[in-house]
């Protein structure tokens, strides 16, 4: 007898904008408030979260959306229906500046894109070569340096118009060589050159990726942003709770390396969505808006490659 009455009371309170279902969901599924686990990066360029790609739509993405479109749900008359909106922030979220014939020293490179070793397992290129290729660094001399630099797979040194190039992710701060081979010989040459205090000049194309600060500011102005597990139980539970509250929300999967999470956008101009956001924040659900702000601060304070 009491359960139906409690249910009716909950529905009554939801009708007046109290997020009862959402509160119950957060109590029953604490996994929704798990912190955003960053991938183990080491010295791998492929483990850097590709925030510059967040606005792009991949060929295999679902739901199929045109550039700048975001899928959402909200009340529509007596129904709770899906809708699609165009948010220009996602057409300009990431930026890439390309510099041809860019120069640096081998010591400026802090990570690589490809190696036979697991690049995510090492804190530095020195640690990788010490662990897996000690023979390559046994001869700390100009001869040992020249031998490693002569390796044909270091394409930046031995190819005309090589595919290898430099990449700098402004929110990460490190410079990477996006290589197709020669990782251990490159790291060994870098190791030896540092101990000989000998410069090794490099030249190639630099691609500098950054997050558009205005796009982030616009999203944060219009929405409270959170990240939840991209799992059926969590996503369906949140959807049902928002439907019970009749509050709108938008969602979008996060970039590569964070593909186990999805972003939730709660409109700041809708009182019910604002109440839902306050409850998510109170429960400790990951604040994606704050995280993006931190990335921009890191991006602004990181020295760009010269």
Question: What is the role of each PLM region?
Answer:
Residues 199-226:
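Charge-dense polyanion-binding interfaces
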Residues 16-176:
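Short alpha-helix boundary/capping and kink motifs at helix termini
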